[in-house]
């Protein structure tokens, strides 16, 4: 399936139904008063987040969405039927912007959340509303109002708990394939991954955590070079970053610092996210050699934390790495829970 994370669409709410001109005509009331009903309200356009969607691909083929118009008012003061709303399904994580004003209209994070993006027009008033002392038989009614028309920009940010970042060819796709049932395209050359890949990694308890293989970032990504902005955007919602560095590269330390700099320059608190550092492809080097040991110590000094030596291909060190990630996620969950739990009020002995 092709991954599309941005789209532009036009939404048109329904027009309100026209009010009706009608008069009461019954057997013993040959000249009754006005009885024209109001027009029905036009349908609105509503976006709804649906769990089984992961891309905005559908909007590549359909870009205009219209709600139903309201029906005309009827005789005997009957209000016309309202137009049906138009529901547009989007994946969770979709942000909705007005294309002209760039106003954020909605951020649909959870399945079932909705956002009304275009209100249907009000129905026109029937002639019963224009009865007055000077006009006992008004022969006019109001037309329904037009519904809202908007151009929208949809932007999808992946809802992954762990984002795997690193330069191209660091082994991110291989790692997510080793940890989950995801099968991303893998090859031994840079930029194999051109779109984010999602994989669900299972804990020993059976619970799943969504990992996102973010396509390889390059120097200048924060300024939009390559597909930098598109890729960095997907990191914003993650709870934890797994920074993967190719230990066999010419200068792994420089590669690490390049990515850290891009996160800092891009801003939006990306540089403050908790990170786990893993040096990949250790099956291709002598991990006990002095050169590698010196490199690992250097990384410990720079990152100020643990450094994991892994091989996504050979499965080396993956269990220890995952234990660290599970522990950090659980710790964060506990902190969040404690912040949400209200502190019970103190009761003095006199009050008790």
Swiss-Prot record:
GO terms for cellular component: cytoplasm. It is found in: Cytoplasm. Its cofactor is Mg(2+). Residues 1-159 form the Obg domain. Mg(2+) binds at residues 173, 193. Its EC number is 3.6.5.-. GO terms for biological process: ribosome biogenesis. CDD domains: Obg (cd01898). GO terms for molecular function: GTP binding; GTPase activity; magnesium ion binding. Keywords: Cytoplasm, GTP-binding, Hydrolase, Magnesium, Metal-binding, Nucleotide-binding. SUPFAM superfamilies: Obg GTP-binding protein N-terminal domain, P-loop containing nucleoside triphosphate hydrolases. It holds the Pfam family GTP1_OBG. Residues 160-330 form the OBG-type G domain. The keyword Cytoplasm applies. GTP binds at residues 166-173, 191-195, 213-216, 280-283, 311-313. Monomer. NCBIfam families: Obg_CgtA (TIGR02729), PRK12297.1 (NF008955), PRK12299.1 (NF008956). Belongs to the TRAFAC class OBG-HflX-like GTPase superfamily. OBG GTPase family. HAMAP family: GTPase_Obg. An essential GTPase which binds GTP, GDP and possibly (p)ppGpp with moderate affinity, with high nucleotide exchange rates and a fairly low GTP hydrolysis rate. Plays a role in control of the cell cycle, stress response, ribosome biogenesis and in those bacteria that undergo differentiation, in morphogenesis control. This is GTPase Obg. It comes from Trichodesmium erythraeum (strain IMS101). The gene is obg.
